[in-house]
Swiss-Prot record:
Keywords: ATP-binding, Cytoplasm, Kinase, Nucleotide-binding, Transferase. PANTHER family: GUANYLATE KINASE (PTHR23117:SF13), GUANYLATE KINASE-RELATED (PTHR23117). Belongs to the guanylate kinase family. Residues 10-189 form the Guanylate kinase-like domain. It comes from Myxococcus xanthus (strain DK1622). Gene3D superfamilies: Guanylate Kinase phosphate binding domain, P-loop containing nucleotide triphosphate hydrolases. CDD domains: GMPK. NCBIfam families: guanyl_kin (TIGR03263). It is an enzyme of class 2 (transferase). This is Guanylate kinase. HAMAP family: Guanylate_kinase (MF_00328).
Length: 209
């Protein structure tokens, strides 16, 4: 970027991680401490699990409704995963741009990469567990998955970690939650202060957007 480049308004924050790394807890803490932020609630065609709530954890729709949303361009990214469709609403991006606020996406690497391709100014942050052993321990401590499910999650985690480390802008290790959140918040502060995000046109110096 040259000195006169100005990025679009709003800060698109993408958080990804393998299951059990703690990204959702970090994302909700960030939302709580960022009053003007918009949180992206994914749309999915799968059925609710456990205590999941409509409009809180996901927006649950049938396949026909999802396909209609695709045709109307209502998703900033969407994908089919294990026979179910998942998508992130374009309206979240539009709202963050209009309000010059932050949009927070809690999605997988595939979705994060899709957003980055469409919006190169998006900030991608990958949350790592301190070790694979600790990740497996966390999954077992949930006491919600069978041994076979945990085995599949661990295999998927290795692939997700490799892709995240290779392509994401930042990596945050979630060993201690408060330290991890401090690191995450530091990324947000630094990105807000990037030269390309600061409008200096009002200074009347003939620079900036």
């Amino acid at each position: 970027m040259n000195a006169n480049t100005v990025l679009p308004p709003g800060l698109l924050l993408v958080l990804s991680a393998p299951s059990g790394a703690g990204k959702t807890t970090l994302a909700h803490r960030l939302l709580k401490e960022t009053p003007d932020a918009v949180f992206s609630i994914s749309v999915t065609t799968r059925r609710p699990r456990g205590k999941e709530r409509e409009g809180v954890d996901y927006n649950f729709v049938d396949v026909a409704t999802f396909q209609s949303k695709i045709e109307r361009g209502e998703f900033v990214e969407w994908a089919e995963v294990y026979g179910h469709f998942y998508g992130s609403p374009q309206s979240v991006v539009d709202e963050a741009r209009a309000r010059k606020s932050a949009a927070i996406f809690d999605i997988d690497v595939q979705g994060g990469q899709a957003i980055k391709r469409k919006h190169p100014d998006a900030v991608t942050i990958f949350v790592l567990p301190p070790s694979m052993e600790e990740l497996e321990r966390r999954l077992r401590d949930r006491q919600t998955d069978s041994d076979e499910t945990i085995r599949r999650r661990m295999l998927a985690a290795r692939s997700e970690i490799e892709r995240g480390i290779a392509s994401y802008d930042y990596v945050v290790v979630n060993d201690d939650f408060e330290r991890a959140f401090s690191d995450l918040r530091s990324v947000v502060v630094a990105e807000r202060c990037r030269r390309e995000r600061v409008d200096v046109s009002k200074l009347g110096l003939g620079i900036g957007g």
